[in-house]
Amino acid sequence: MEPLERGWITDGNIEKFDEVAEAVRRAVKKCGTRTKNVAMALPPSAVITKKIVLPGGLSEQELEVQVESEANQYIPFSLDEVSLDFCVIGPSASSAGDVDVLIAASRKDKVQDRQGLAEAAGLNAVILDVESYASRLAADRLIQTLPNNGADAIVALFEIGAFTTSMQVIRNQEVLYDRDQAFGGAQLTQLIVRQYGFTPEEAETKKRGGDLPDDYGSGVLQPFVESTAQEISRAMQFFFTSTPYNRVDYAFLAGGSAALAGLTAAVTQQTSFPCSLIDPFAGMEIGGGVRENKLRREAPSYLTACGLAMRRFLQ
């Protein structure tokens, strides 16, 4: 894992290409991999997705023509300016003999930025996914370990990033609701800066290393944990008021700030729903050269990356 400074990537746009490319090179060097093919992801804000219904039995070429025709209705750009892809989900539940097809499109400049990052690090981008789709892929494997293989369970997945927390509510691999909220781990860093007078860089380093004054737990961390739990509870209330559902069976926390001491307990207390950290490596064999304690400690941060890596086994 290699941290990026604030402002290097904003709303999915790579603002400091050279700096981000150098960070990618450092990450590749650290992990020691000889693999050159990589899977990458765009944030949902950079991708337009739409589920459409098309006649069943079409060839791949016929599907492509139909998708391009339908896409013009939903994409506010010329098709020459976007990278477009689609996949057949399965038979349509609403129209006998037809199939549901998911189309996804992103501006070519955003796609080329990701490809350029890979090339700058000596890598070859073979898959470009959407972050939320990759997260769900990794989470779905874990949902299947729940009682009754997770069938009909309503699972709320929260990914707590630096500036944004993403919520997805999933049932039987279907997304019932999704929402982004503007809060994240960077707010904790800002609290540390204000409380102790550190620079933002010092605060981030000390936060990650646990090298903070004795009153940090009670004076800074605990209020932030309680505030985060309240935000998560508020997000659930939005779900309940926006859909016919009134319960969540399980809440999973992922992301860089998910493992903060006391957060899962605070969420359970705020919401009355069971909450736990997600470990995308659960049930996997860990290689001998991997520092397992460190991996387990940071595991919630790797949910999206794990989902991207799993694409290798789903081709």
Language-model features: locations:
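Hydrophobic/aromatic-enriched cytosolic interaction surfaces used to assemble or bind macromolecules
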Residues: M1-Q315
